[in-house]
Swiss-Prot record:
InterPro entries: Flu_matrix_M1, Flu_matrix_M1_C, Flu_matrix_M1_N, Flu_matrix_M1_N_sub1, Flu_matrix_M1_N_sub2, INFV_M1. It is a peripheral membrane protein. Most abundant protein in virion. When expressed alone can form virus-like particles in transfected cells. Plays critical roles in virus replication, from virus entry and uncoating to assembly and budding of the virus particle. M1 binding to ribonucleocapsids (RNPs) in nucleus seems to inhibit viral transcription. Interaction of viral NEP with M1-RNP is thought to promote nuclear export of the complex, which is targeted to the virion assembly site at the apical plasma membrane in polarized epithelial cells. Interactions with NA and HA may bring M1, a non-raft-associated protein, into lipid rafts. Forms a continuous shell on the inner side of the lipid bilayer in virion, where it binds the RNP. A motif (Nuclear localization signal) lies at residues 101-105. It is found in: Virion membrane; Host nucleus. It holds the Pfam family Flu_M1. Keywords: Host nucleus, Membrane, RNA-binding, Viral matrix protein, Virion. This is Matrix protein 1. Residues 1-164 are annotated as: Membrane-binding. Belongs to the influenza viruses Matrix protein M1 family. One of its GO terms (molecular function) is structural constituent of virion. It comes from Influenza A virus (strain A/Memphis/2/1978 H3N2).
Length: 252
């Protein structure tokens, strides 16, 4: 796996699923391929994206700044600086300075990542802030190691939280989660179907599913009534893909 592929993997792991994630993935690919060289426009686009947390925007802004060539005097962006200040906690800043000194001695991506993984996400973000604000300088490889370690820490906590939700025995939470997943799947089906004539059937199925979820929410249904909703939708989607001559593994 190349270095940039690894960076893209880690960064995308902390972006919530949805159309915006696909858009961000495309921007990262373009940036890493050298196709997008307007850092100013890229940062303006990032700043106005909805849904993303300030920290995720800060990390993406840091990655874009590291990768896109820019004029020396280009102004640092406030939204990135604010996100990478470790919540203003002096302890985070102290640890960030210690980590920075260690990173100065590293020359490889993996070496930097290993060193950084023993620090908290707050300290890692503060250390990125030091580098972003030009208070410290490390090689791009080392900076990417720091980025990936930060994303791993964040993804770990997100995964723990997600696992807790999936494993919950509370039937109301499970019911709502199944309806949300069914609704999201229906939305994805509508986007994939596009405008071809054969797509009408898939669009109809997706539309009915979304109406059904809305009705279930409006009238309040038994928690078990949502069981299998998403799987039924995916089966319909696969049947549609087969007719279109597309063979894809089931993506559950």
């Amino acid at each position: 796996m190349s270095l940039l592929t690894e960076v893209e993997t880690y960064v995308l792991s902390i972006v919530p699923s949805g159309p915006l994630k696909a858009e961000i993935a495309q921007r990262l690919e373009d940036v890493f391929a050298g196709k997008n060289t307007d850092l100013e426009a890229l940062m303006e686009w990032l700043k106005t994206r909805p849904i993303l947390s300030p920290l995720t925007k800060g990390i993406l802004g840091f990655v874009f700044t590291l990768t896109v060539p820019s004029e020396r005097g280009l102004q640092r962006r406030r939204f990135v600086q604010n996100a990478l200040n470790g919540n203003g906690d002096p302890n985070n800043m102290d640890r960030a300075v210690k980590l920075y000194r260690k990173l100065k001695r590293e020359i490889t991506f993996h070496g930097a990542k290993e060193v950084a993984l023993s620090y908290s996400a707050g300290a890692l973000a503060s250390c990125m802030g030091l580098i972003y604000n030009r208070m410290g300088a490390v090689t791009t490889e080392v900076a990417f190691g720091l980025v990936c370690a930060t994303c791993e820490q964040i993804a770990d906590s997100q995964h723990r939280s997600h696992r807790q939700m999936v494993a919950t025995t509370n039937p109301l939470i499970r019911h709502e989660n199944r309806m949300v997943l069914a609704s999201t799947t229906a939305k994805a089906m509508e986007q994939m179907a596009g405008s071809s004539e054969q797509a009408a059937e898939a669009m109809e199925v997706a539309s009915q599913a979304r109406q059904m979820v809305q009705a279930m929410r409006a009238i309040g249904t038994h928690p078990s009534s949502s069981a299998g909703l998403k799987d039924d939708l995916l089966e319909n989607l696969q049947a549609y893909q087969k007719r279109m001559g597309v063979q894809m593994q089931r993506f559950k």
